[in-house]
């Protein structure tokens, strides 16, 4: 699947939005990728995650376990794991706490794991996911996402592959360009805004 085909999946689903958005990180952006619109369509999700599994295999080889951060990463993680023939597990957090691996999930010795995210903006969720796996016996070999909107600047601590890398601007609320500041902001994501 080419980058343009991936973006067309988002466009045709109405999931590539323009306006003034407050991202989960608290940063502001003129573009928002509403991935849950994508994940509400099983056929579209299957196409994208099959393509992501191919990219993962090409870069990292054999994968035994896909680990995703809850909630946004669970659907693409599961569907990508299905195409990899791997197990799908996830990390979750108590409100305000760190991610933890629960529910009897583990990464046993000798296994190779990859973190699968939906969209990477700063890499925070993937970094927090990786930190929660530090005591696992298996090896976390890399990370993957459908769209890397950081322009390749997301800091994860692992090699990152994606179907598309975009350089979508994100601004601090106190450094907005005038054209963005003129539009009332909306908060479409799921994570609570950071406390000032």
Curated annotation (Swiss-Prot):
Pfam families: Pribosyltran (PF00156). GO terms for molecular function: magnesium ion binding; orotate phosphoribosyltransferase activity. Pathway: Pyrimidine metabolism; UMP biosynthesis via de novo pathway; UMP from orotate: step 1/2. Its EC number is 2.4.2.10. It catalyses: orotidine 5'-phosphate + diphosphate = orotate + 5-phospho-alpha-D-ribose 1-diphosphate. It is an enzyme of class 2 (transferase). It comes from the Bacteria. The keyword tRNA-binding does not apply. InterPro entries: OPRT, Orotate_PRibTrfase_bac, PRibTrfase_dom, PRTase-like. Keywords: Glycosyltransferase, Magnesium, Pyrimidine biosynthesis, Transferase. CDD domains: PRTases_typeI (cd06223). Orotate binds at residues 121, 149. PROSITE patterns: PUR_PYR_PR_TRANSFER. GO terms for biological process: 'de novo' UMP biosynthetic process; pyrimidine nucleobase biosynthetic process. 5-phospho-alpha-D-ribose 1-diphosphate binds at residues 117-125. Its cofactor is Mg(2+). Belongs to the purine/pyrimidine phosphoribosyltransferase family. PyrE subfamily. Catalyzes the transfer of a ribosyl phosphate group from 5-phosphoribose 1-diphosphate to orotate, leading to the formation of orotidine monophosphate (OMP). This is Orotate phosphoribosyltransferase.
